[in-house]
Amino acid sequence: MLDITVKHIDELERYIGAFRKGQRFFYAGKSLGLSKLGMNAIRMPKHWEHYPEHDHAADDEEELYIPLEGSGTLHAEGQTYPMHRGVLIRVGAATRRKIVPGPESMTLLMLSDRPDSK
């Protein structure tokens, strides 16, 4: 028997919690039944400034950011990195980062080595 799960991003379970209004955060990995990989998705409106600056030093979680739609900028410890479709960005656990969408809304897929990632 095939072990395949297919879902559109709009079918994923939504997270409703500490994030600020304007964004939509999805439990992608949980919705797809992933058990060995953390995966979430977020849709942010243009120029949205409320993505929290954070790191994952306490839980030693590295992240991979994959922009699906739109564009933005990753800010990390005084450096900036353009984010747009086709670009993959890995960020180590101890690096503080913040993401700001550009002049259009941005949909971002986030992968990690922790299945329980939020």
Language-model segments: residues:
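Short strand-coil-strand connectors
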Residues: 33-35, 75-79, 102
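Glycine- and acidic-residue-biased ligand/ion/polar-headgroup-sensing regions
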Residues: 60-73, 77
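A short, N-terminal "cap"/entry segment at the start of jelly-roll beta-barrel domains
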Residues: 1-38, 45-46, 118
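Conserved hydrophobic/aromatic positions in well-ordered beta-strands
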Residues: 40-42, 65, 109
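Conserved short histidine dyad/triad with adjacent acidic residue
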Residues: 25, 41-59
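Ligand-binding loop in jelly-roll beta-barrel domains
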Residues: 33, 93-117
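Short acidic-glycine-tyrosine-enriched beta hairpin
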Residues: 78-93
